[in-house]
Amino acid sequence: MAVLAKFISKNHPSVPIIIISNAPESAAASVAAIPSISYHRLPLPEIPPDMTTDRVELFFELPRLSNPNLLTALQQISQKTRIRAVILDFFCNAAFEVPTSLNIPTYYYFSAGTPTAILTLYFETIDETIPVDLQDLNDYVDIPGLPPIHCLDIPVALSPRKSLVYKSSVDISKNLRRSAGILVNGFDALEFRAIGSHSQRPMHFKGPTPPVYFIGPLVGDVDTKAGSEEHECLRWLDTQPSKSVVFLCFGRRGVFSAKQLKETAAALENSGHRFLWSVRNPPELKKATGSDEPDLDELLPEGFLERTKDRGFVIKSWAPQKEVLAHDSVGGFVTHCGRSSVSEGVWFGVPMIGWPVDAELRLNRAVMVDDLQVALPLEEEAGGFVTAAELEKRVRELMETKAGKAVRQRVTELKLSARAAVAENGSSLNDLKKFLHATRD
């Protein structure tokens, strides 16, 4: 939400924004210096002893526990100023009834982008037309605004019809149609299929839907400061030829087994290409050692670091992703397909290889490969394992072949479209103006 708040403030600095959250105030440090943005911290709710421990279910349930505190906060703020709109992250659907009970126009924001927004909007129809668990269907689902999506590419958490996440998703789908509008981290050229579907039959699926505003891509600022350990890789990139380095980075959730790390190392060595690789400690070793920092000599094949030292750089854990993608030496990006990573890859014009690791990421890959054509797919074995031969093949394909050149050309075109969307009179800034105008009515 902080990135969205900064985007609104940058383009409309006179609009006052209050971020309401129960996260520590340190989480709002990035907006502390912006006069139009303030932070209201909610008290942490009391957690019932029988609360679910499932990570995904917690995303949906924790906001419900904060509803009494949210109601109090909105009432207090309303005594000082008129609240023209509330924007909810879609994970905070449980809070929808709080602002609407106060007659405050309530919008949903999808930072995860259009594929997730469309799937969520369509989910009530899926619930009514597909009577079995999605993972058992073994077929494609036709969703207006998306390419044909195989059921195995729909987040696995949505499969058990009796699960809390499934029921919450149906509830969100219904509330989306009751909301004042939907804000999506995307832009016209990136969402051409969704926009075409919406214009032809206004995404009505189960009835009329509210306006959809594409206001992206929301890409944070690039920090090119040198000298700190985490930016050492940027100095290494300075010594590499233009568009020669393959960057591998997999987000917060991209943690691989020791076996997969060895397989990845073999692929990179055999490919012969330059690489920058962000490695995190495997779950089994992190649990045993209590450390996030991997022991590269122990994890990677014997002699790998020495043999590849002239063309490879391995980062322990965190990598400055935006800064790396912005560097001229980077010519390819192996990504977990998270929306932020996809947006950054497009923004900086870096062709991608899609390696989804969780949740909505398979859905994102399907769109990246089939619709946008900005990525090559990786074929996975059972359990999501990727062989060295498969990864080597895709790296070579991206960096050496006509297919890779076509992906590079397409992502370069979208890079220009992305920057045009957030320039003066661009499509995303125009949608932002429409949204703000709607809140003044």
From Swiss-Prot:
pH dependence: Optimum pH is 7.5.
Enzyme class: transferase
Keywords from the UniProt entry: Glycosyltransferase, Transferase
Temperature characteristics of this protein: Optimum temperature is 30-40 degrees Celsius.
Keyword set includes Protein biosynthesis: no
Transmembrane stretches, start-end: none
Catalyzed reactions per annotation: baicalein + UDP-alpha-D-glucuronate = baicalin + UDP
InterPro entries, alphabetized: UDP-glycosyltransf_plant, UDP_glucos_trans
Family: Belongs to the UDP-glycosyltransferase family.
Complex and partners: Homodimer.
Biological role: Involved in the production of glucuronosylated baicalein, a flavonoid that shows antiallergic, anti-HIV and antitumor activities. Can use baicalein, scutellarein and wogonin as substrates, but not chrysin, apigenin, luteolin, quercetin, formononetin and daidzein. Highly specific for UDP-glucuronate (UDP-GlcUA) and no activity with UDP-glucose or UDP-galacturonic acid.
Protein name: Baicalein 7-O-glucuronosyltransferase
Higher taxonomy: Eukaryota, Viridiplantae, Streptophyta, Embryophyta, Tracheophyta
